[in-house]
Amino acid sequence: MVQQRTNETPASKRASTIDPVDVAQFSALSEHWWDEAGPFAPLHRFTPVRMGFIRDCLQDLPRAPATEVDRSRPLAGLRVLDIGCGGGLLSEPMTRLGADVVGVDASGENIEAACAHADGVGLSIDYRHTSAETLAEASEQFDAVVASEVIEHVADLDAFTAALSDLLRPGGGLLTTTLNRTLRSLILGKFAAE
């Protein structure tokens, strides 16, 4: 779902949104992010579907009038935050579609894996080991914020969504995706896929 930001809320000091147990679990798997047959194989298979949805949702967001957008780079001129980027499975394709991507993750190991892979394929992505609330407190702003398969790992949902709102420029788009709230989705998505 993409939401347009219509008001400006000043960043404020927030409780941590980071769940240390989840961070430890993903950190332990960080060397496997780009192994298409490894523990993140379901995410690799799902990425083309997610990217089609992300492209369709973000490509019509407002951007600088001088930005030339062609079909191969429909996200050109957009500064996009990929919050909870993991190993960069969405950051890389968004960059290839023309976005200026900042990928953020609470796991330093995930950021190291993302940086190594991006360097290996010649992509320039600004990866950071930080949190949404820290970026909001620093008054960072983005045309779009993508939080895909992240909110189920957040310790304080209210603080997280407030931080995401603060990170959006006026008229920006917030896109969040998560699993259905069913037992089957929980088992297949959170435990089997991640």
For the regions a protein language model found, what residue spans apply to each?
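N-terminal, positively charged/glycine-rich alpha-helical extensions of SAM-dependent methyltransferases
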Residues: V2-F40, H44, P48
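N-terminal alpha-helical modules
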Residues: Q3-K13, D60, A64, E68, ...
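Residues within alpha-helical segments
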Residues: E31, P48-M51, C115, D119
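A C-terminal cap/extension of S-adenosyl-L-methionine-dependent methyltransferases
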Residues: F40-L43, V121, E194
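Conserved alpha-helix/loop element of class I SAM-dependent methyltransferases that forms part
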Residues: R45-A76
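Conserved SAM-binding loop
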Residues: A66-R73, L78-L186
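Conserved Class I S-adenosyl-L-methionine
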Residues: L188-E194
